[in-house]
């Protein structure tokens, strides 16, 4: 269920967790975002969030040469999109024990656990996320 709350600007405000791919698409290739994802990202009433795990994933994959996104690029993307960094806690980590193994990517599994614990929808182009019961996907 999408977590809704009254907006200080009037109306309904939606929290949305961007997965790493959604952030990269938003920055490097917005044409790869779905129409729905673009609309949600561009709505100023929505609160966009990024897992701290996504920053870890970007740093590791950049160091391994799998991504061409520097720390400065990531910082700029977060600032330009007005994204709030969602800290990763032990509550999120313990939820990993309950997740079925539909997905072997450790970064994605941590982000999925975080979205489930926080009860917020996630923006992702990854079809495997839909295998997780209770996870609301915006794409």
Predicted segments, located by residue:
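Basic, glycine-rich
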Residues: 134-138
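Short, well-structured N-terminal submotif of metal-dependent ribonuclease cores
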Residues: 1-50, 64-76, 80, 118, ...
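Active-site neighborhoods of divalent-metal-dependent phosphate/nucleic-acid chemistry enzymes
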Residues: 11, 66, 71, 80-125
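Phosphate/NTP-binding elements of NTP-utilizing enzymes
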Residues: 58
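Alpha-helix capping/helix-boundary segments
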Residues: 22, 54-55, 92, 111, ...
């Amino acid at each position: 269920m999408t977590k809704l709350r009254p907006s200080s600007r009037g109306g309904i405000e939606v929290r949305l967790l961007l997965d790493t791919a959604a952030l990269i698409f938003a920055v490097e290739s917005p044409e790869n975002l779905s129409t729905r994802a673009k609309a949600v990202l561009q709505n100023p009433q929505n609160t966009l969030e990024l897992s701290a795990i996504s920053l870890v994933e970007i740093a590791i994959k950049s160091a391994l040469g799998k991504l061409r996104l520097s720390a400065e690029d990531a910082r700029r993307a977060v600032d330009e999109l007005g994204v709030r960094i969602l800290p990763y806690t032990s509550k999120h980590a313990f939820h990993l024990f309950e997740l079925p193994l539909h997905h072997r990517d450790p970064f994605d599994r941590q982000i999925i656990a975080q979205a489930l614990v926080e009860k917020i929808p996630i923006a992702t182009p990854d079809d495997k996320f839909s295998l997780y019961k209770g996870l609301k996907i915006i794409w």
